Curated annotation (Swiss-Prot):
GO terms for molecular function: aminoacyl-tRNA deacylase activity; ATP binding; valine-tRNA ligase activity. Pfam families: Anticodon_1, tRNA-synt_1, Val_tRNA-synt_C. It comes from Herminiimonas arsenicoxydans. Catalyzes the attachment of valine to tRNA(Val). As ValRS can inadvertently accommodate and process structurally similar amino acids such as threonine, to avoid such errors, it has a 'posttransfer' editing activity that hydrolyzes mischarged Thr-tRNA(Val) in a tRNA-dependent manner. A motif ('KMSKS' region) lies at residues 559-563. This is Valine--tRNA ligase. PROSITE patterns: AA_TRNA_LIGASE_I. One of its GO terms (cellular component) is cytosol. InterPro entries: aa-tRNA-synth_I_CS (IPR001412), aa-tRNA-synth_Ia (IPR002300), Anticodon_Ia_Val (IPR033705), M/V/L/I-tRNA-synth_anticd-bd (IPR013155), Rossmann-like_a/b/a_fold (IPR014729), tRNA-bd_arm (IPR010978), tRNAsynth_Ia_anticodon-bd (IPR009080), Val-tRNA_synth_C_sf (IPR037118).
Length: 969
């Protein structure tokens, strides 16, 4: 296969992603003699397209999968998509809204058909994007969380949990999104501080009696003045919920009110009598020290109500309007319209004492931004703290208890380890899980009701009828309309994708999976729940390790979101996109269209020329370079450019190797070298003669292989990327290729063969090492390099994917060669620095004289001569007993002295040095003046101060050298 002159990723990627899949390389094996590696894809929501976070997450997962596949493991990466109940229903409802249609106009059955249509369209977009990213999951195992096999498992799990007493139905206070018309979990509620008001309202004593209320105190805190009152003052941020008040609570230690505990108040606007109660929940220092208690509309009040056996009066409908339990004057009003009217009515009756601005935490739905209402509704719950019955895997222990134990024992390991604290904290404070949602899209709850409301939980309607008949009921049954929380089915993925409840070969081979790669934002949503469900139903943990990575943010650290207009589509980084198309993409379909102008302005400023096409490999290398443990990632597009240059460097290096090796004897015989046949530095004559440089690059390769193996073991893809970059760019391309040129041009035939063999073998190994991170370019290059490097290609086609992953061979470490090369590098750098100091043109070749301390060193310096001549652009290199007297600068490397033999115009050089010394003096004075300014040091960013200090250090070092040269002149 001929290698193109330049690296053009598009055609290469299109060919290989089709070819790999066609050849069946992604399909998992279940060979009993092999170790297994399995990994679950966090199923992306079927609602749309992949974002940069997916690109990051999938780069890591694919890297691990390719690495273990090359190491000979049975490798199963299981892909799938999530039905994403709320999110998907919102998307489809918005589409209908554009046609002036509601889901209720269509009816449940027709609406669900529409959602399935959307799923088919969107799901294929997502899998197409995954393929573009070069991912290699076993597509034959692809699932959808609402496909038939998964739905059967969901039903089976639900029924079993009900039979075990671990799922129950009850009327409880839940987070209610009045726009969606469904319960949502705590994790789907975002609370942020907002500007609001505090209203102080007078609640009159029902019997009309009065009491003395202190209004002034001395320094010791004793009351000095009182006023006569026949009311108490309640402070609230939600006056509309007072219509559902059932008590007013005070601090048991608050002497202002203790004598009133037990008395009745008249609830304003409602003419109901409610008691004054004492409860530790109240803080006497906050507000007026009196708190209205509305158990049906506040979680804290609900707890107080439970302690005091209070009624629960719900005054809101499910769409947040005032209901029939409130006075007729407010019924049917929106909650905020009612608030306004209630405040006006209180004021008119002289019961509104004070209104003041107040900052408060407002809970909003993360999907709709609607203010969440605590609402008393009938819901289904999983009992998180109830002991499991006999016959389960962990009888006598709750599912939460088992989930905590599995992390504590190390059966499930979280990386970084600090995430275990977050996991434990959440589980130790867990509430029963509300799993029902008042939606149409999702797994419909497998429960049927008879005409009297009695419920029969069953795997299907026929089974429900059998259960009803057993209890003497033969009438019609109505199925529960609610669906399950999306996270319920997602929590079952570790075993629902492996054939459970059957013990299939997949189940035995791939559970627990080896690692879960996930962002910290779904530790609670998904990770903990998978541990609970998998241990409860299989007795096994779902995964051995959880690799928790940071979240991708924009370059300034802002969270990426559609509303901020700062999202990036990974495909746009691969293919490139014009600024016009990028603006259009970011401004279409905004929740708030008014944001379009500011988003367009910011986008044009940041990407005036759009985004260049970087290709998949450059994007993947960028992602890998960011993948340290745990921290958030400020994504900088310039890194993609740097890693595209890296891919170009690797491509061009391969072209150089091919040009020097194709059609040549590259040192490969059918049989391995006979004893003494493979020489080192000519010490044994024969077919190949390996130089110190050859052995150095092979030795460095072993160290790189060790570092990369550790990177994979520790999930430190940033270290893997760094090791690859440093070895390929710095060592192989910048140093070894340059040395190899010299050896091919000036060496004996045996040395040339050894050089070509080393060039090819190291390059072929590099390609296998880098393949898990940059699969496309490595495959394309390997196809041309491998046959030359002695690899026998399979007649039906071969692939780097199926080759063994390189492993370090300690026997090939060579510290002597490494020492030799380190000295050559120092010598080369010294020569280059001398050229710089003397301001010699890069085109000018000058002689080098080296002074050796003894005969042995003279021979060593002589071995460097041909390399130095090429690397430092010298006309000749001479080794002498002593350097000649000359005003030219001298560099010392170890015991050797180096001088460039150049005629110097002493007068002109003194004048040049004088000017340069004066300039540097001025720069140092200016910089020191800045650093001596306290305001500058205090106010400037630490990075700027450090840069200024570094400038002073560099200028000072250069100045010292120039002064030494000046003295010599």
């Amino acid at each position: 296969m001929e290698l193109a002159k330049s690296f053009d990723p598009a055609d290469i990627e299109a060919f290989w992603r089709t070819e790999w899949e066609k050849r069946g390389y992604y399909t998992a094996t279940t060979d009993a003699d092999k170790p297994s590696f399995s990994i679950q894809l966090p199923p992306p929501n079927v609602t749309g397209t992949l974002h940069l976070g997916h690109g990051f997450n999938q780069t890591i997962m694919d890297g691990l999968t390719r690495y273990h596949r090359m190491r000979g493991f049975n490798t199963a990466w299981i892909p799938g998509t999530d039905h994403a109940g709320i999110a998907t229903q919102i998307v489809v409802e918005r589409q209908l809204d554009a046609q002036k249609i509601t889901r209720h106009d269509l009816g449940r059955e027709k609406f669900i058909e529409k959602v399935w249509e959307w799923k088919e369209k969107s799901g294929s977009t997502i899998t197409g994007q995954m393929r573009r990213l070069g991912t290699s999951p076993d597509w034959s195992r692809e699932y959808f969380t609402m496909d038939e096999p998964r739905s059967k498992v969901v039903t089976e799990v639900f029924v079993r949990l009900v039979e075990q007493g671990l799922i129950y139905r009850g009327k409880r206070l839940v987070n209610w999104d009045p726009v969606l018309g469904t319960a949502v979990s705590d994790l789907e509620v975002v609370s942020e501080e907002e500007d609001g008001h505090m209203w102080n309202i007078r609640y009159p004593l029902a019997d009309g009696s009065t009491y003395k209320f202190p209004i002034a105190y001395d320094e010791a805190g004793n009351a000095t003045e009182w006023e006569e009152r026949n009311f108490i003052v309640v402070a609230t941020t939600r006056p509309e919920t007072m219509l559902g008040d059932v008590a007013v609570a005070v601090d048991p230690d608050d002497e202002r009110y203790t004598h009133l505990v037990g008395k009745l108040l008249t609830l304003p606007l409602c003419d109901r009598a409610i008691p004054i109660i004492a409860d530790d929940y109240v803080d006497k220092e906050f507000g007026t020290g009196c708190v209205k208690i509305t158990p049906a509309h506040d979680f804290n009040d609900y707890a107080v109500g439970q302690r005091h056996n209070l009624d629960k009066i719900s005054i809101l409908t499910l769409d947040a309007k005032i209901n029939e339990h409130a006075p007729a004057a407010y019924q049917g009003m929106d909650r905020y319209a009612a608030r306004k009217q209630i405040v006006a009515d209180l004021d008119a009756q002289g019961l509104l004492e004070l209104v003041k601005p107040h900052k408060l935490m407002v809970p909003r739905g993360d999907r709709t931004n609607a203010v969440i209402e605590p609402m008393l509704t009938d819901q289904w719950f999983v009992a998180m703290s109830k002991p499991a019955p006999e016959g389960t895997h962990f009888p006598g222990k709750s599912i939460t208890e088992v989930a905590l134990e599995k992390v504590a024992s190390g059966e499930v390991k979280l990386l970084p380890e600090n995430w275990a604290n977050t996991y434990n904290q959440w589980l130790n404070n867990i509430q029963d899980w509300c799993i029902s949602r008042q939606l149409w899209w999702g797994h419909q709850i497998p429960a049927w009701y008879d005409s009297e409301g009695k419920v029969y939980v069953a795997r299907n309607e026929e089974e429900a009828r059998t259960k009803a008949a057993a209890q003497g009921y033969h009438g019609p049954l109505t199925r529960d309309e609610d669906v399950l929380d999306t996270w319920f089915s997602s929590a079952l993925v570790p075993f629902s994708t492996l054939g459970w409840p059957e013990e299939t070969p997949d189940f035995k081979n791939f559970l627990p999976s080896s690692v879960l790669v996930t962002g910290f934002d779904i530790i609670f949503f998904w990770v903990a729940r998978m541990v609970m469900m998998t241990t409860h139903f299989t007795g096994k943990v779902p995964f051995n390790t959880v690799y928790v990575h940071g979240l991708i943010r924009d370059s300034s650290g802002q969270k990426m979101s559609k509303s901020k207009g700062n999202t990036l589509d990974p495909i746009d980084l691969i293919d490139g996109i014009s600024v016009e198309d990028l603006v259009a993409k970011r401004t279409v379909g905004l929740m708030n269209p008014k944001q379009a102008a500011s988003i367009e302005k910011a986008t044009r400023k940041e990407y005036p020329n759009g985004i260049a096409a970087y290709g998949t490999d450059a994007l993947r290398f960028t992602m890998a370079s960011y993948a340290s443990l745990g921290r958030n990632i400020n994504f900088d597009l310039h890194r993609c450019e740097g890693y595209r240059n890296f891919c170009n460097k690797l491509w061009n290096a391969t072209r150089f190797v091919l040009m020097n090796c194709e059609g040549q004897d590259c040192g490969f015989r059918d049989a391995p070298c006979a004893a003494g046949d493979c020489a080192v530095d000519g010490k044994a004559g024969g077919y190949t003669d390996f130089s110190q440089a050859d052995r150095w690059i092979v030795s460095k390769l072993q160290r790189t292989e060790t570092d990369i193996a550790k990177g994979f073991a520790d999930y430190r893809f940033d270290n893997i990327a760094s090791s690859l970059y440093q070895f390929i760019w710095d060592e192989y391309c910048d140093w070894y290729l340059e040395v190899a040129k010299v050896q091919i041009q000036t060496g004996t035939e045996a040395q040339q063969r050894a050089t070509r063999r080393t060039l090819l073998r190291v390059l072929e190994t590099i390609l296998r090492l880098a393949h898990p991170v940059i699969p496309f370019i490595t495959e394309q290059l390997w196809q041309t390099v491998a046959p030359l490097a002695g690899h026998k290609m399979h007649p039906a086609g071969d692939s780097i994917m199926m080759q063994p992953y390189p492993e370090a061979q300690p026997g090939k470490l060579d510290e002597q060669a490494e020492s030799w090369m380190a000295e050559l590098k120092s010598m080369t750098d010294a020569c280059r620095n001398l050229r710089g100091e003397m301001q010699l043109s890069p085109a000018l070749r000058v002689p080098l004289i080296m002074e050796a301390g003894d005969t042995e060193q003279a021979a060593r310096l002589q071995s460097f001569a041909p390399y130095l001549q090429a690397l430092a652009k010298l006309s000749e290199v001479n080794v002498a007993d002593q350097l000649p007297e000359s005003p030219a600068p001298v560099s010392i490397v170890g015991a050797a002295k180096l001088m460039l033999k150049v005629e110097i115009d002493v007068a002109a050089e003194r004048e040049r040095l004088s000017k340069e010394i004066a300039r540097l003096d001025g720069e140092i004075t200016k910089a020191n003046s800045k650093l001596g300014n306290e305001n500058f040091v205090a106010r400037a960013p630490a990075q700027v101060v450090a840069q200024e200090e570094e400038r002073v250090a560099n200028f000072s070092a250069t100045l010292e050298k120039l002064r030494e040269q000046f003295i010599k002149l």
